[in-house]
C-alpha cells in the first residue's frame, strides 16, 4: 500500500506531510520551501505556474494570476461574500451556467476546483519526488465551518489532481492531532484550537483522552467564519494606503491593476514585518504616473495604525469562541490549552485578544503553518495502519434538515453531532391525493428555510393516493466521515425509495469532473513535453557554447572544410532552437556532435601536448636541482625561556 499524504490546502499557503518511521515529516517543495503559496498563474505562452514562480510574476500578470481561490470554492456567484471579492480581486470572477462562482481566464471559463487541483498536483509531485514512487491517495483538510458544497468541491479538486481523497478532515482537528500525538499526559485535556488563516476562521473545542496509550480526539463543538482571514486584513491595509496616496497625490490607484498588485505584495510584507517591528516603510518607486511625471509611494505604517485598522476583524472572531464554548457546555476555565493555527495568528493583537479571552497564554510549541498538514498526515497514517491507538471523533459544523410545510427548516441532524452519523424521521404529505413529494435539503441554523444554505433537492414519486397526513415518508440523513451527506426518502407503504448523495444544486456534475480530470492528465503530458523541450534546449545551448570555445582555441588545427561544416551546423542548430520541435533540436544536436569530431580530436591533441610540455619542464627542473647537490642549513637558534 502506497503512502497516504496529508495536505493542508490553504487559502494563502499549502503544505504537504507524510508519516515516515512512525513520525510525521513536512516535505520541502522543488524551491526548497516547506510551504507553497496557493497561487496559480496562466502565462501568455500557455504555461501554468504554481506557487512561488506564480507569485513572482503576479505584478506583470495580475489578471491571470489567481490567489485566495479557496474563498470561492463551492460558492454561488450571487453569495454576498463572492460579490465582495468581485469588486476587489484583480482577476475576473463570473457566474457559471448553474450559478456557481467561476473564473474567466483569457476568455476560458475555469471552475475553482480546477485551480485548487493545480495546487494539489504540486503537493502530489513534492511527495512523489521525495518518496520516489507514485502517490494516489490523500487526506485533505478543510475549514471546520465549510458546508457540504465546499467539502464536495474540495474532493472534486483532489480527483481532478489525480488523487483519491481518503478523508476530508477539519483543519482545527488536524492541528489537535499534530499537537496531541506526542503528548504523554494521561486523562482528559480540553484544548481550544483557534485557526485564523489566509481566508477562513475556525474555532474548535476538542477533548483529548489518553487511556493506556490509546488516544481519543473528540471534537465537542466547532464554529467559525469561512470568509474571514489574512486576506481581509491585507485589504484593509491596502485601502488605507490607497486613500493616503490619493490624499497626497490626487491619484486613485484602484484604477491601475499593476499598481494594485505591487501594493498588495507590499501590504502583505508590511503586515508580516509589523508582527515583529513597531513600524515599517511602504516604499514603492514609480507606482504610477500622470502628466507631471512618475509618482512614488513612501509611507510609514506603525503597528498601532495597523491594529486600529483591523481590530474589528479580530473582534469578529470572539463571538464564535463564545458560541463554541456554549455548544460544548464548557466555561473558559475548563480549557487546559489554547493552540494557535494559521499565519495570521502571528499578529501580536490576535495573540493578545485570544490570551485575554481564555485567561491564559496560547502554546508556542505548535508551528501555525505546518500543524494542519502534520495532522492530516497522522490521519492518513491512521487510515493506512501506520499510526496505531488513535481515534478521531469529528463533528458536523452546521445543522442539516429539510424544508417542511410553511417554509420551515426541520432539522434531522443538529450541529456538532459526532460523525459519521445517521438519523431518520417520518414525514407525511401536505395535500390530499399527493402523488409525489419534493425533498429540499438544507444546511444552517435559521428557522426559515430560505435563510439557510440549499444543498439540493430531489423527488420521490409514485405515492399512492390518500388523504393528507396518511402516507408515511421516511427521510434518512447519513453523514460519512468526510462530513458529506447522503439522503434517502422511502414511502413506507409501497417500499418505493429514492437515494442520492447530496451534490449542491451548484457544484460540478460527473461529466464536468471527468472532463477536468482528462484535461489535467493532458496538461500533465503537456508539462512533461515542455520539460523535455527545455532539457534538450539546455543541452543544445551548452553544446553551442563548448563547440564555439573549441573552435576559437583549436580551429586552426583542422581543415577548412571541417571548419566550414562545423560553422554551418552551429547556425542550423541555433536556428532550430527557436522552434518548439524537440525532435528537430535532437537531430541537429547529434549532427553537430558528429561533424565536430575532428575538433574534439584537435582539442584532445592540444591537451596532450600541453601535459607533455609540463612533464618535460618538471623533469628539467628536477635534474637541475639534483645536479647542484647543495644542502642549505637552516639558520635557527634555540631561544631559552628566561627564568
From Swiss-Prot:
Biased composition (Basic and acidic residues): 606-625
Protein induction: By stress conditions e.g. heat shock.
Keyword Chaperone carried by entry: yes
Annotated segments matching region Disordered: 605-643
Keyword tRNA processing: no
UniProt entry keywords in alphabetical sequence: ATP-binding, Chaperone, Nucleotide-binding, Phosphoprotein, Stress response
Residues modified as Phosphothreonine: 200
Domain of life: Bacteria
Protein's job: Acts as a chaperone.
Family of the protein in this entry: Belongs to the heat shock protein 70 family.
Protein name in the entry: Chaperone protein DnaK
UniProt gene name: dnaK
